[in-house]
Amino acid sequence: MIKEFKEFIARGNVIDLAVGVIIGSAFTAIVKSLTDNLINPLIGIFLGKVDLSNLKFSIGDATFKYGSFLNAIINFFIVAIVVFILVKIINKVVKNEPEEPEEEEVDVSAQYLEEIRDLLKEQAKK
């Protein structure tokens, strides 16, 4: 069981996924800071409130806190744009890498037929 676990962990996909999750967590913190400390104050200048997360309205006893939702939407769009740009860059890099030509696997029977043909040609010359 330990051997299987080592093989599972050693596969590239698991390691790539782990790296992606760690980088994603760090990136989320950066985007949240960008939104909270730069974008929201800029939007707040026009709305008259710097902290969008406190935006809300009430209907009767119900309070709708839409400011946090706006923050989440802004965060989502920032992440989506960055991921889109990264995917475009990665696709461009992958396209520019020359592909190694794959060796054609010759069918064994075709190989035998070619050898027989060559032998028959040699016999015909004699």
UniProtKB/Swiss-Prot annotation:
Topology of this chain in the membrane: Multi-pass membrane protein
The name this protein goes by in its record: Large-conductance mechanosensitive channel
KW Transmembrane (keyword) present: yes
PROSITE patterns: MSCL
InterPro entries referenced in this protein's UniProt entry, alphabetically: Mechanosensitive_channel_CS, MS_channel, MSC/AndL, MscL_channel
Presence of keyword GTP-binding: no
GO molecular function annotations of the record: mechanosensitive monoatomic ion channel activity
Subcellular location: Cell membrane
Tree of life domain: Bacteria
The gene coding this protein: mscL
UniProtKB keywords: Cell membrane, Ion channel, Ion transport, Membrane, Transmembrane, Transmembrane helix, Transport
Role this protein plays: Channel that opens in response to stretch forces in the membrane lipid bilayer. May participate in the regulation of osmotic pressure changes within the cell.
